[in-house]
């Protein structure tokens, strides 16, 4: 079961269509395997349809907006059962290849990456797949902007906890971490970066000028 989910504001932006294509892809991947968040988005979609139908010219006040978020956070949600035998997820459709067959490029430590930003030509953010070998470590780093990540395979841990398959996490300039892949399987993630990461290790920080 997923332990790390998009917050209610993020789900509301997704429901309203106010999200870039790469970020929407991350949400769709999470929703495909998280019945709890899928039910919350269904609730938001229904609420939005009612508001559009009944009050198309009325703007949502700040207090009403807060009430909607509180309702989504606090109302009990009956998760719908996950369906087995689903078709290819949207990332597989986009790439046309299994994750294990992609042309990974080895980087520092036990990490490999594949930049797939070219699949989103209208976006300015960098979209990358990242892979840590089982038990491997990524270099310690922080972020110059926001990084949105979903775990596609395996799991990793850092100072914030353990992130397993289909977990969702958002990091920014305040976060410094050194992800470690759990034993048993390579950890593969999809990340969207608004700016390059910043290495913080004693020696690796010398490479910062060369990081895109």
Stretches with model-predicted labels:
Residues 1-9, 22, 32-35, 43-100:
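Positively biased amphipathic helices and basic secretion/translocation or surface-docking motifs
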Residues 12-22:
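Short Cys/His-rich Zn2+-coordinating modules
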Residues 41, 138-141, 159, 177-183:
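Short beta-strand His + acidic residue motifs that chelate non-heme Fe in jelly-roll/DSBH
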Residues 102-134, 139:
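A short glycine-rich, His/Asp/Glu-containing loop-to-beta-strand
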Residues 133-136, 142-158:
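Glycine- and acidic-residue-biased ligand/ion/polar-headgroup-sensing regions
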Residues 158-178:
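Short acidic-glycine-tyrosine-enriched beta hairpin
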Residues 175-199:
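Ligand-binding loop in jelly-roll beta-barrel domains
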